[in-house]
Amino acid sequence: MSSSDARSRIRDRGYSEVPRDTSCPDGTIRTFQSLHSSELAVSADPLPPPPLPLQPPFGPSFYSSDTEEPAVAPDLKPVRRFVPDSWKNFFRGKKKDPEWDNPVSDIRYISDGVECSPPASPARANHHPYKDPSRGSQGTFNSQHEADAMFAHDPYASLDRRTQTARTYSEKVEEYNLRYAYMKSWAGLLRILGVVELLLGAGVFACVTAYIHKDNEWYNLFGYTQPYGMGGLGSLGNTYGGYYYSGPKTPFVLVVAGLAWITTIIILVLGMSMYYRTILLDSNWWPLTEFGVNVALFILYMAAAIVYVNDTNRGGLCYYPLFNTPMNAMFCRVEGGQIAAMIFLFVTMIVYLVSALVCLKLWRHEAARRHREFLEQQEINDPSLSSKRKMCEAAISDRQRDQEVNVKDLRTTTKMTPELLSGHIPPGHIPKPIVMPDYVAKYPVIQTDDDRERYKAVFQDQFSEYKELSAEVQAILRKFDELDTVMSRLPHHSENRQEHERISRIHEEFRKKKNDPSFLEKKERCDYLKNKLSHIKQRIQEYDKVMNWDTQGYP
């Protein structure tokens, strides 16, 4: 028998046979690791095929013939790289399919970021009692402890973990907004201004340094003293409001630009840290300190700009014909880079001033935030303060809303247009319900002539009632006005006790007359009829306006 037939028989037997016995003679349970290939039995349920090897075999085929030479594994040598792969991947960026570049040993069973159902674990597929067909019911496992002993070391435990699902576009946008929402605040505006200041400062430094050779030529020609023969010009300049010029001040401008650049980058890096957001913004002194730093840099840049502009005309010497000779013309000529440097200096000065103003705004904003958090903490500690605050805010909002209502405008009253408020709704605010009169729904817009005649009949029928009630109510109100005038003349404090009691009784009776239910009912009915008739009249006038009818004969 050849060796290939033996290997094929062993391979076929491994797929068609299952463990025959799982217990030792002493009654103990053995795991899969302790089972031997010789202890196999026939079963209706074959074992699942083993997983494919992670590394393919070497050679032309796995089962080669005996005549072929045995495959020899290549001599693998460790690869030593001067630059680590992590650094290369960082500078190389992302690839479309990075899995294809990984070695075979790095390929995992579960992909990252793909939403899929994890495969079922073949080790713990069945939790019901297992029966051995060769032994009947004696091979039943009823204990979970025995099952755990059978699967002591589960090689597929990693498959039970939950896979990481891919994020949707909305989740990415939400994460982006949460990450960069800080840049929308006043502190974020300061960081943006800091980046602008760094760019402008670098421009100032580059433009000023590009023409520093002119200073070298000045010192080579005139030295470190005033130009020869210009002493009189110096005194002449003092006479006409000038000042003494001893040489270029470019080093001062470079020192100011460098100092401001270093200070700005320190503040910018500090502002992007969590220490700035959690500790410094909660303090009272840091926004004012940042304001002082920006003001100081603004003053330094203003001084540097003035000094650099003064250097371009050599302290005013270029305006004198005695100095502005062909030999000295190169010192008075202003190059394009120098003009750019002056522009950068003044723009940077303005940006630092804007940063100082933003620091003041940030200081006020953070103070208001701390005060609001303090009030919320007090409300949590003392619930009575929260109820009082809500009642106060509701009363203020009601008072403001009552002041805006115009009682004299009957058209607004009849239309009953709901009030539209825009802005922040205070906590605890309870809106007032809108009471819609019945005649608004009962008498809609007139569509036909019959509706107009019906509205006209209702108007004429109830107009007489309104006239009677109105005359009666107006008469009572006139009497009340006269009594008010008489009551105002009565003394409020009398020395006689009986007279004081009599005046008090008169006041009490007068108050009862004013609050008489029958009078209040008549007054309410009169107001209702007035609004109803106004509504009906408005409907008739609207219809007549559309139909171009003359309604002057109607009341």
Swiss-Prot record:
Ubiquitinated by ITCH; but this ubiquitination does not lead to proteasomal degradation. Polyubiquitinated at Lys-408 via 'Lys-63'-linked ubiquitin chains; deubiquitinated by USP53. Pfam families: MARVEL (PF01284), Occludin_ELL (PF07303). InterPro entries: ELL/occludin, Marvel, Occludin_ELL. Detected in small intestine, stomach and kidney, in epithelial cells. Detected in pancreas, retina and lung, and in stria vascularis, utricle and the organ of Conti in the inner ear (at protein level). Predominantly detected in small intestine, lung and kidney, with lower levels in liver, testis and brain. In colon, expressed in the entire crypts. Residues 1-20 have a biased composition (Basic and acidic residues). The modification Phosphothreonine is found at residue 163. Residues 1-191, 273-288, 360-555 are cytoplasmic. Gene3D superfamilies: 6.10.140.340. One of its GO terms (biological process) is establishment of endothelial barrier. The chain crosses the membrane at residues 192-212, 252-272, 289-309, 339-359. One of its GO terms (cellular component) is paranodal junction. Plays a role in the formation of tricellular tight junctions and of epithelial barriers. Required for normal hearing via its role in the separation of the endolymphatic and perilymphatic spaces of the organ of Corti in the inner ear, and for normal survival of hair cells in the organ of Corti. This is MARVEL domain-containing protein 2. It comes from Mus musculus. The lineage of its organism: Eukaryota, Metazoa, Chordata, Craniata, Vertebrata.
